[in-house]
Amino acid sequence: MEDPNRMMGGHGGLMPPNYGMPTNDGQAGVDNDPRKQDIGEILQQIMNITDQSLDEAQARKHTLNCHRMKPVLFAVLCEIKEKTVLSLRNTQEEEPPDPQLMRLDNMLIAEGVAGPEKGGGADFLSQSDLTGGQDNAIEHSDYRAKLAQIRQIYHQELEKYEQACSEFTTHVMNLLREQSRTRPITPKEIERMVQIIHRKFSSIQMQLKQSTCEAVMILRSRFLDARRKRRNFSKQASEILNEYFYSHLSNPYPSEEAKEELARKCGITVSQVSNWFGNKRIRYKKNIGKAQEEANLYAAKKAAGASPYSMGGPPSGAATPMMSPAPAQDSMGYSLGSGGYDQQQPYDGSMGYDQLHQDLSP
């Protein structure tokens, strides 16, 4: 009877020696497989792409595009992408505009910074303000010059922004179109990438427009809103008003006719004259000591000679309460300790100012 082991080990046996066990010969066969070597070499070349020079990369790209297996490779990549990449069909076609950006655009258009150049910013001025004298004309001219400067800077920066955005977008689109020759990139994906780039750049546009709006608001506050505030009177106007006040100290309430005459001589409005006298009476009460010195100064001027600004008040020789030490009860008919300023013509104390020599309009 034949030995079973000898039968299995013979060349005519059913199973070869070392069946199912790894051998060095088998490993060597795998290593010597040309296809495995090609794949490994390709992977190594892919890893070394970042180290290549531009000329080397262009040469290899040309070689790949001319390779006879290039269409097959592209078809395989398309098949893989169909299975793995999310579909863009359900993505939103276009996002709604940013409401904050729309508000900034509307403000810039209203102020004449954006859109066609116009007088913008000064349109809300009333005709009375525009004809309010040489000072107003100079102020409005200065405002328009500053606004034109802001407009120029804004358009220069906006042009730089649009140029940078356009250049970067064009560069990315060209890059994606070039890559689409090797890997599948649809026009829809390129359009989506352009939208992403524009959203990134919109933050720069937002900052530019916000800074411009802030500059316009500061300019409005400085030049246009200033006309509602107090302005320095000329030295001549201060002399006229002070002389009338101290020469009528017994009753420093000019009539409407006197106010009109004072306004004409000083080149100011009747309302400014009224406010000046109200503030002057308050300052006189609060600074009675300093007012005494100022009154003596104007009395000396009147004694030296009649002033061309005189409104025909009491005679220069008439004694006034300011010519002697101030009594407990002042010459205007009210107690210094009382809260009222005048029983006949009350004045809103909220408009008063504490500084003595600051002759300003409201």
Curated annotation (Swiss-Prot):
Coarse class of the protein's main subcellular location: nucleus
Region PBC-A: start-end pairs: 41-120
Stretches that traverse the bilayer: none
Domain PBC: 34-225
GO molecular function: cis-regulatory region sequence-specific DNA binding; DNA binding; DNA-binding transcription factor activity; DNA-binding transcription factor activity, RNA polymerase II-specific
Location of region: PBC-B: 123-225
Matching Pfam families: Homeobox_KN, PBC
BP-aspect Gene Ontology terms: anatomical structure formation involved in morphogenesis; animal organ morphogenesis; embryonic organ development; eye development; neuron development; peripheral nervous system development; regulation of transcription by RNA polymerase II
Keywords assigned by UniProt, alphabetized: Developmental protein, DNA-binding, Homeobox, Nucleus, Transcription, Transcription regulation
Stretches the record annotates as Disordered: 305-362
GO cellular component: nucleus; transcription regulator complex
Role this protein plays: Transcription factor which acts with the selector homeodomain proteins altering the regulation of downstream target genes such as wingless (wg), teashirt (tsh) and decapentaplegic (dpp), thus affecting segmental identity.
Protein name: Homeobox protein extradenticle
The organism of origin for this protein: Anopheles gambiae
